Amino acid sequence: MAAATERTDELVREYLLFRGFTAALKQLDAEIKADREKGFRVDKIVEQLQQFVQSYDLAALRDYWGYLDRRLFSRLEDMYRPTVNKLKTSLYRYYLVHTVQTGRNDKAQEFFLKQASELQNQAEWKDWFVLPFLPAPDSNPTFATYFSRQWADTFIVSLHNFLSVLFQCMPVPVILNLEAECHRSSLIQEENESLRHKLFALQAESSRMKKEELEVEEAVVHHKLPAYVANMDRLGDSELDMTCSQRSTAHSLQSRGGFLSSLLSQSKKGPARPAQPSGASPTQTGSVLLGKKEPANHQSAKGKEGTASSKDGKSHFSGLVAGESSSLQQRQKRLQEHGKERRELLSKGTSQVQSAEKKADISTSEPEPCSEPQADQAETSTKMPASSTESVGVRQEQPFIVLSQEEYGEHHSSIMYCRVDCSGRRVASLDVDGVIKVWSFNPIMQTKASSISKSPLLSLEWATKRDRLLLLGSGVGTVRLYDTEAKKNLCEISIDEDMPRILSLACSPSGASFVCSAAAQSPISHMDFSVVTSGGKSMNQVPGKLLLWDTKTMKQQLQFSLEPEPIAINCTAFNHNGNLLVTGAADGIVRLFDMQQHECAMSWKAHDGEVYSVEFSYDENTVYSIGEDGKFIQWNIHKSGLKISEYALPSEATGPFVLSGYSGYKQVQFPRGRLFAFDSEGNYMLTCSSTGGVIFKLNGEDKVLESCLSLGGHRAPVVTVDWSTAMDCGTCLTASMDGKIKLTTLLAQKS
């Protein structure tokens, strides 16, 4: 409701300004500024009550609660009146406990003097009048419960939940329902689009079935990743070649039918062996599907006429018998696969027949999550191994209360980016299939805009001033400006034909410009995966450029100098005022740029391998970086290369991220989005893990990394995170390889 109210206020302002009602507009702004209901923001109302308690302002506390009672609680049915009275009693006791804990017994006595006439006839208050005169009330059995931290936290959460439910259930004017109506219309449009895609998919399947009925060859099956996904790989155009070899006494033929791959997923399918080892490096993005060898002893396919069995017992695939009976059996199995393939086609959101055929080739062996379901309730994490120079501890007292955890599940493939806008109201998410979703989560999750890119997308960034705009970097050398409210592209600019991969985008806090990292295609298209998984460093450091563009004119302002040689920049981040820019590159070097002089102020070798993610600290005197070597390091920006602290993180926090399935395949994704994020004061850090986000406490004095809270909730590895503190309650985003995004709302426990 708060989001709808805020949006309606903006619409009313726009209307009054359009009509020239300036006096009414000024009056509206004045009343909104003095709004005691805080725009139906529950967190703001609770914060206001806490401020009155902490300032010992009893009169203001009584007056504000009375206003809420008249304005909101009076609308409730009589059956809820006891609940309101209990909350009021708890609020007064919360005030009294605070006065005693802070040594202000005079305020406690003042409370009973002013409230005596109201409270003396209430049975629940008869024991409380002696409170100011007890020497140690926190040890008294009557009052000990109320002096515990648990009771105070429970009261705040109960009050927060009560107000939230009240705002969701109260009747609202018609104008506030406009957003819901728009959302309903959007859902209908999406449903129509989905049905249209389904029609195209069925037509494609029908055409393919007619062609395959004419083919009787059997086969070596050649699998390739679609170029759409392959171009996103950081090392280059990774492709997956699967060779099916058949040793039969009769013959060995090749099949041109792409749909034969669906037959191999049945009981007659043997293990796949890659023709060429393939791998990837974080200079290119995407998920790489790799074949995993299985035991090679399989029986040959059965047919009514019988087939010749494999002589050596070691062939990877057994033969399929050609003949009428075998063809009939194949067609029956194809029909069993049609439902699954159509769902896969619809989830990818394409209406092209060629694209549908490509996606069907890889949909038959979709990896399944190997981990058990994680409990939704947050729990304390175990101790994390540290490097030889730093230690990692376990924090016993949790600094946050988990208010809720929700799931956004409209993506159907691995997430690359997931970012909250500056206002903390909307989220933009991008998956490896080029599907962009813009959605809100307050008060309920709603998809505001959805788009499917024809060209592969590699990067995403919110504009800072006009937070309705998104910057989208592609794999074909272009950057698009997308309006999330109008749901259309405002413009598209070409960066560099020789540097087609836009690896990173960062918008200046002033909103006047943005930096763009462009990189060339990798000259190496295949790499041995064993090198990558064993921790080997990237051998493919491609050249790149770092460019500054004007946001208004969408013209290039300058190109930064990258020393010692031009290199692909993987990650970029501005400080709070945009005067400094920190970057992490494929050569392992962190560079700090002076944006006023437009030159590199300092650079240093930070990691053995590529730099995956960089961020400024809260005080901006240091920067943090995560690299291919699995280290999380803090650097002093006032002295080049001065290391303040270093921690060794597990591979599940730094990547590459691996999702294994029972089908024998592995899906591997290299880091692309943000790998860590800080809270509002920079004391806590959110990172990735195999089952959800993990929060650590950063302790600069003791140089330890304390594991505080495990958010959990994921069945697949988390590949990118974000932490929004624009609202009073922190919002943690964790996105995983199965396309699920968890949104966890945290309430900080003030010490």
Curated annotation (Swiss-Prot):
It comes from the Eukaryota. Residues 264-395 are annotated as: Disordered. It is a peripheral membrane protein. It is found in: Early endosome membrane; Late endosome membrane. Keywords: Coiled coil, Endosome, Membrane, Repeat, WD repeat. Residues 188-212 form a coiled coil. This is WD repeat-containing protein 91. It comes from Gallus gallus (Chicken).
